[in-house]
Swiss-Prot record:
Propeptide boundaries: 18-41
Keyword tRNA-binding: no
Gene Ontology terms: cellular component: extracellular region
Name of the protein: Conotoxin LvVIB
Organism encoding this protein: Conus lividus
Tissue: Expressed by the venom duct.
GO molecular function: ion channel inhibitor activity; toxin activity
Lineage, opening ranks: Eukaryota, Metazoa, Spiralia, Lophotrochozoa, Mollusca
Segment forming the signal sequence: 1-17
Amino acid sequence: VLIIAVLFLTASELVTADYTRDKWQYRAASLRDAMRNFRDTRCSPGGEVCTRHSPCCTGFLCNHIGGMCHH
């Protein structure tokens, strides 16, 4: 009976540790996506002025000579 109890406790600790690791990976991915979305809310779309403080949105490049975002 003691051996069965030890095996059960060991198995439950392994399952809990695996679940916790997956939970942290999900949180890290969510934080990364939130930061990416935050950056895109401060960006300049195509045809708008781009600066050091307001870079072009994803998919656009800043023409530093004229300071305009373009494809």
